[in-house]
Amino acid sequence: MNFRLLEKYDPKAFEDEIYNKWLKNNVFLPNNSLFEKFSMVAPPPNVTGVLHMGHALNFVLQDILVRYKRMKKHNTLWLFGTDHAGIATQTVFERNLKNIGKSKNDFEREEFVKEIFKLKDKHRGVIVNQIKKLGASYDHSRERFTLDESLCKAVNKVFKDLYSKGLIYRGEYLVNLDPGSGSVVSDEEIEYKEVDGKLYFVKYFIDDSSFIEIATTRPETMFGDTAIAVNPNDERYKSLVGKEVTIPLTTKKIKIIADFHVDSAFGTGALKITPAHDPNDFEISKRHNIPKVNILTQDGKLNENVPLQYQGLSIKDARFKIEIELMEKGFLKGVKKHRQQVGHCYRSGEVIEPYLSTQWFVSMKPLAEKALKALESGELRFYPKKWENTYKYWLSNIKDWCISRQLVWGHRIPAWYNIDTSELIISDTDPSLDEKNVGKRFVQDPDVLDTWFSSWLWPFSSLGWPNITVDFENYYPTKTLITAYDIIFFWVARMVMAGLEFTGQTPFRDVYITPLLRDKQGKKMSKSLGNGIDPLDIIHEYGSDSLRFTLSFLSVQGQDLNIDAKDFMLGAKFANKVFNASKFILLNLENREIFNNLKFNDIDKWLLTSLNSTILGVESSFANYKYNEASKFVYEFFWNDFCDWYIEISKIDLNSENVDIQNMAISKLLFFLKKALLILHPFIPFVTEKIYSEFSEKGDILALNEYPSFDISSNFKEEFESFKVFKTFIVAVRTLKSEFNISSSIEIDVALKFDSDFKYEGYFKANESISKRMINFKNIFYNENCDGMLGLAVVGFEIYADVKLLIDKTKELIRLEKQLEKYKMLKISVSKKLENENFLMNAPKEIIESEKLKFVEFSSLINKINSYIINLKNL
């Protein structure tokens, strides 16, 4: 058998070729079998987005599971698509327009939408091609976009159904205005940042000589004040309740009212009430039936309800100008620095302004109750379980969802207003086309729906709902959702609510929340901090498999993932090891006869049992979404058991003078290599597929082969335990050589003394050829006098090595004493930490666990070094 494997591991030389091979052979399509179904939807990335490490982690973990299920012969469908991302995409487009001296006002609505579709078509390929680089094995033929016609149909149906049930309504409420986009955003789209600001102390005059002092961080909003509130128990102001004050820089008078909401201890204890621009003031205004005055335009400028000289100014410019005028006219008593939490739109970065506006809302409490019951009944499960608390908190404290957005790009609200009568009709199309509305004129609501309004339908709308399609019947509900913690409410909870409301089922059973990515300093990776790692850089440097394996290996369920670019060497070294070990085997295939009838000896049976154990470990790990454990099982099997032990031992037979022995050895190596490639494939699909293609039948694709299952007939407990004990002998001698800097190539005499009840003596003697190759002894003695030899005790037997002529006893004792002192000091340091109550109460859990592991490690090293010292002294 001949082959043409590359000289060295070079993923750039074959990864694209392999992916195209999978596409050409329809590897990613469901097999439509009668076997158990497994379906999953991917969180749709923004259509104009670019791949970041969070995407990479999410898609890699999804793909590993999908490939595993596909190889387990599940009827597997992984659905992928992109999100139209209303605010984000329109912002990108308007920024592009600005660069060429244009704005959205230069376009009719339909033309504007068409132009954004062109941008979408141009950019969609970027994120999609980047996700392909990860090896994502989603069904390309079923790729969706949230503005596809079928998804628009689903969105409109849901809107109409909720409206008819009284769960969608329109009303005037205080909402969050993003001045950058001119649109409102939901509470969940706001991130709070601590910023340096000012606290202004302003005089509101009652008459020419008396005033009440107000502390405010936003003096520009005083033009929207409709009252001053004080606490009714505040003795300072009791006599002023009911009196009027004049708003500074105006002639407008407002009343002083009493309300228990006012904190007497904050500022001056008197609160300006601006109902149209503060949520607390809005609630106070409802209690006291006072008016609401909006002073802002939708793009964050001051409007006609402020004095003329401030109209049209931005908030920042108005604040600066007002501060000067307040000071000049004697209204400003003082200013001091004030650090405060300010809400920003997480998409645009703009400061959010509370804004009184008429918007569309979904009444969420009735939907949330069902979603909570789904968790309580076990229909829905979170991994790690701790995220259930976040889910419950959000749903237990849910507010109505503002779903209208003042954008052009998105699902236009299917609401129409009669121009003459203001009659409201909910319809997909212009109601005037209906014969019962002949002569009536209608205009459609200009707003679009929140992006999440289409995303919350994703698990079933992407399968063709509201039509009951074959895909919907076959693959809904899906099995698993893999996503990030920060969209548990945005997306996960809402999908559960929508699924229960419109299909009567939870849209998925299991929700796995991926680790939070942090840098090595523990800071969350973010664009603003500039501490992210570009996954494409990692792929270019090390290959996709290296990225995949590292992310999986380090993804501990329930723990943050602190990572830097150097960590990806872990995956690179492993992929390289797989390549080189495979290459060694394939090189030895040349001019060999491959036997089909394999004869397994004790060492083969040990590896078969180890393989069985690995298969069970991987299965259990995936059942509980423990990616790091699954990765470690395959890593340990391949690197330690297969490479370090089995291949090394096989070299004895490969170098035999008997050709049949040689052929049997390489046949068994090839057998185990295929098994290894199969269990590794979900983690490192590119290199395993490449290697497999070099010795498999033409057209045979590894990704479509069946994942190995536990085989009771290949479970040899006795042989496994025998070799396990035998390994302790080899490892102990290797460690001893290493500890005393004796080259592995130097032959030494070794002696063994077995305990009277030791049952593996015959096994040790029968496998002398293996122990000689692995530890390179000169002579081996059994149960003889071992005077003058360095001894080590292990369970069941004692090991002695003749090293006295190879080491300087005095120097070694000095070295070991120094080592002993070093580890004793380290142990004391760790012990003090673990005895410190403050440390145990305040340190992160993973740090405490790390210190505990150090304590155990240092204790073990101290015992080992003490043993060496005692044995050396007895030489």
UniProtKB/Swiss-Prot annotation:
Taxonomic superkingdom: Bacteria
Binding-site residues for ATP, renumbered to this chain: K527
Entry keywords, A to Z: Aminoacyl-tRNA synthetase, ATP-binding, Coiled coil, Cytoplasm, Ligase, Nucleotide-binding, Protein biosynthesis
Entry EC number(s): 6.1.1.9
Keyword Acyltransferase: no
Biological process annotations from GO: valyl-tRNA aminoacylation
CC annotations in GO: cytosol
Residue interval(s) of motif 'KMSKS' region: 524-528
Location in or out of the cell: Cytoplasm
Principal place of residence: cytoplasm
Motif extent ('HIGH' region): 45-55
CDD domains: Anticodon_Ia_Val, ValRS_core
Coiled coil: 803-837
First-tier enzyme category under EC: ligase
HAMAP family, per the entry: Val_tRNA_synth_type1
Self-association state and partner proteins as the record states: Monomer.
PANTHER family for this protein: VALINE--TRNA LIGASE, CHLOROPLASTIC_MITOCHONDRIAL 2 (PTHR11946:SF93), VALYL-TRNA SYNTHETASES (PTHR11946)
Domain notes: ValRS has two distinct active sites: one for aminoacylation and one for editing. The misactivated threonine is translocated from the active site to the editing site.
Biological role stated in the UniProt entry: Catalyzes the attachment of valine to tRNA(Val). As ValRS can inadvertently accommodate and process structurally similar amino acids such as threonine, to avoid such errors, it has a 'posttransfer' editing activity that hydrolyzes mischarged Thr-tRNA(Val) in a tRNA-dependent manner.
Family: Belongs to the class-I aminoacyl-tRNA synthetase family. ValS type 1 subfamily.
Protein name per the record: Valine--tRNA ligase
Record gene name: valS
